[in-house]
């Protein structure tokens, strides 16, 4: 490919709405263009990277016996209603009606479609296990699309689904996917973590995420340096002990707290620490209101709440709903005298004489005690684990980091097969629901994650495995006939040998070419310039300042050998150490 023909419009200036390095460099490097918030066009360079990522993923899927299919993006609501997720999935689901007023969704995932497909085709345990996958566009109506490709409304994903006659068979496939995903990460050349994760709206009873550490990552990871425990903050358990307070219970008293609503304000006004205040949070779900109680100095983990109550539709009640249904402004809600289901974090159990909302504007109760003053229906671990909390395995203080989730695997069990009546006949002639797993990989976000991992102040540093082109040949003076002739010859020789090579034959300055080469991130650059008078060309790795001079007076043998050596030694990790 010639640069003068390549559609790669680079930008000198950074677009104003850029929030991350990957977003900036992919826009400036001519890889993507924004159509609308969270929606992008992939230009030729971006498409080449995507295809290479897809091929790596496809090769690893085929290696473990998964079979590729392609399912429709447009999905009928009936299937989602069968599984119970039409209402549970939440506002991220893009819903629409056709001209006949029938409900559809632009698929955010395909469990319903694939379960419906298989239940009509597979009848016997002899046909199991079966794993199907696709690489296709997905849609989620993100409330705030951001970070470029990392949180988009339209994105490319590999989703796979496995069907089994036994849990043992699912376990085997699950481990195969763990190994396959690890190989994908290794082929990308990035550092990664495998962490325990929450199942969320997908469901199931076990889940792991494959995460690339990154400062701008939206996955919060807790890990233990001693025993190796790793989990997302949505999943991390708190198994530390809570103090059982021994003080005498004091008489309950309602006190005026004018305009005092937040934990900090209540703490200062009443002269009590936040740990002696209990937050009362009202949520709405399928079964109506539920009040959640947690110590004032802790944060509620919504993912744990939804998992424990088995209701992904749970959301915090709005101030308007609370005022209408309870007659109390937000900030003064409390558990005393309220007839709703109450669930509490274990941190509340050992408290004595604590503060709660007074269920009346500008009031709070002091010296509240459980179970004297109110009843808790269910107790759970609902707190968000943070850095410094004890490891649930060995008790050592946990460390925290951030990461970008690329892969997510789930043991679904019979969640979908039972709901959608997908059965097979086992060896005893009995009808049983399929035991399922599902396995996602974010293809388009992989591109952004790799850039976040491998870059410098000048641009992207692509690993060889997914670089749009491996080599760029820069003719530094297009008015020099010898440089043009030699540059063209090197380009021809490399092309004939199957190298993915670009010839920069534009009538621009050498500095302009160097800046574009660094911004785009070509792994290896060959300079054909002034040193050609001595029969020498220069080779340079993208992340290195060293120029390797190669004599070509007697042909291109030494050049080809040096290029192969550079490719063998090429390691973008050297740029981020």
Swiss-Prot record:
Signal peptide segment: none
Keyword Cell division among UniProt keywords: no
One biological process term in Gene Ontology: prolyl-tRNA aminoacylation
A cellular component annotation (GO) from this entry: cytosol
Catalytic activity, reaction form: tRNA(Pro) + L-proline + ATP = L-prolyl-tRNA(Pro) + AMP + diphosphate
Subcellular location as annotated: Cytoplasm
Keywords assigned: Aminoacyl-tRNA synthetase, ATP-binding, Cytoplasm, Ligase, Nucleotide-binding, Protein biosynthesis
GO molecular function: aminoacyl-tRNA deacylase activity; ATP binding; proline-tRNA ligase activity
Enzyme Commission number(s) of this protein: 6.1.1.15
Record carries keyword Amino-acid biosynthesis: no
Superkingdom per UniProt: Bacteria
Domains as described in the record: Consists of three domains: the N-terminal catalytic domain, the editing domain and the C-terminal anticodon-binding domain.
Family matches, as NCBIfam families: PRK09194.1, proS_fam_II
Function summary: Catalyzes the attachment of proline to tRNA(Pro) in a two-step reaction: proline is first activated by ATP to form Pro-AMP and then transferred to the acceptor end of tRNA(Pro). As ProRS can inadvertently accommodate and process non-cognate amino acids such as alanine and cysteine, to avoid such errors it has two additional distinct editing activities against alanine. One activity is designated as 'pretransfer' editing and involves the tRNA(Pro)-independent hydrolysis of activated Ala-AMP.
Subunit details: Homodimer.
Family statement: Belongs to the class-II aminoacyl-tRNA synthetase family. ProS type 1 subfamily.
Annotated protein name in UniProt: Proline--tRNA ligase
The encoding gene: proS
């Amino acid at each position: 490919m010639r640069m003068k023909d390549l559609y790669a419009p680079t930008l000198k200036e950074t677009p104003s709405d850029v929030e991350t390095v990957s977003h900036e460099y992919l826009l400036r490097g001519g890889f993507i263009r924004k159509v609308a918030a969270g929606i992008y066009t992939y230009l030729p360079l971006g498409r080449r990277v995507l295809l290479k990522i897809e091929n790596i993923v496809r090769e690893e899927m085929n290696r473990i016996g998964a079979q590729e299919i392609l399912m429709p993006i447009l999905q009928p609501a009936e299937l989602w209603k069968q599984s119970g997720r039409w209402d549970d999935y939440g506002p991220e689901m893009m819903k629409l009606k056709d001209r006949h007023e029938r409900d559809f969704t632009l698929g955010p995932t395909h469990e319903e479609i694939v379960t419906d497909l298989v239940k009509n085709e597979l009848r016997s345990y002899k046909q199991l296990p079966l794993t199907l996958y696709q690489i296709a566009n997905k849609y989620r109506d993100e409330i705030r699309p951001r970070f470029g490709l990392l949180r988009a409304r339209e994105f490319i994903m590999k989703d796979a689904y496995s069907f089994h006659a036994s849990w043992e068979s699912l376990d085997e496939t699950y481990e195969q996917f763990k190994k396959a995903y690890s190989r994908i990460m290794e082929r990308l050349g990035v550092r990664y973590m495998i962490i325990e994760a929450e199942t969320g709206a997908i469901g199931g009873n076990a889940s792991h995420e494959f995460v690339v550490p990154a400062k701008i990552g939206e996955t919060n990871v807790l890990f233990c340096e001693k025993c190796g425990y790793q989990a997302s903050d949505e999943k991390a358990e708190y198994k530390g002990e809570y103090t059982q307070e021994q003080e005498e219970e004091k008489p309950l008293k309602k006190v005026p707290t004018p305009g005092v609503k937040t934990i900090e304000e209540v703490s200062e006004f009443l002269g009590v620490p936040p740990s002696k205040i209990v937050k009362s949070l009202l949520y709405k779900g399928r079964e109506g209101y539920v009040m959640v109680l947690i110590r004032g100095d802790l944060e509620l983990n919504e993912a744990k709440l939804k998992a424990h109550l088995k209701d992904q539709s749970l959301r915090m009640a709005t101030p308007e709903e609370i005022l209408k249904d309870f007659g109390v402004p937000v900030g003064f809600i409390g558990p005393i005298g309220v007839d709703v289901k109450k669930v509490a974090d274990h941190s509340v159990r050992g408290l004595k004489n604590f503060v709660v909302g007074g269920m009346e504007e500008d009031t709070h109760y002091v010296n509240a005690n459980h179970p004297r003053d109110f009843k808790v229906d269910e107790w759970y671990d609902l707190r968000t684990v943070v850095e410094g909390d004890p490891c649930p395995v060995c008790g050592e203080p946990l460390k925290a980091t951030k990461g970008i989730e690329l892969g997510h695997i789930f043991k679904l069990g019979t969640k979908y097969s039972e709901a959608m009546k997908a059965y097979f006949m086992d060896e005893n002639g009995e009808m049983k629901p399929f035991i399922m797993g599902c396995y996602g990989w974010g293809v388009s976000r992989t591109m952004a994650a790799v850039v976040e991992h491998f870059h410098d102040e000048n641009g992207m540093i692509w690993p060889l495995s997914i670089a749009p082109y491996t080599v760029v040949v820069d003719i530094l003076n297009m008015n020099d006939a010898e440089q043009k002739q030699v540059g063209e010859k090197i380009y021809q020789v490399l092309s004939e040998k199957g190298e993915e090579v670009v010839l920069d034959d534009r009538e621009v300055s050498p500095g302009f070419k160097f800046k574009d080469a660094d911004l785009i991130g070509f792994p290896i650059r060959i300079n054909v310039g002034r040193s050609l008078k001595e029969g020498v060309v220069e080779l340079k790795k993208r992340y290195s300042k060293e120029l390797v001079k190669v004599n070509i007076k007697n042909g291109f043998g030494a050049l080809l050998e040096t290029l192969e050596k550079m490719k063998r030694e090429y390691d973008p990790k050297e740029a981020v150490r």
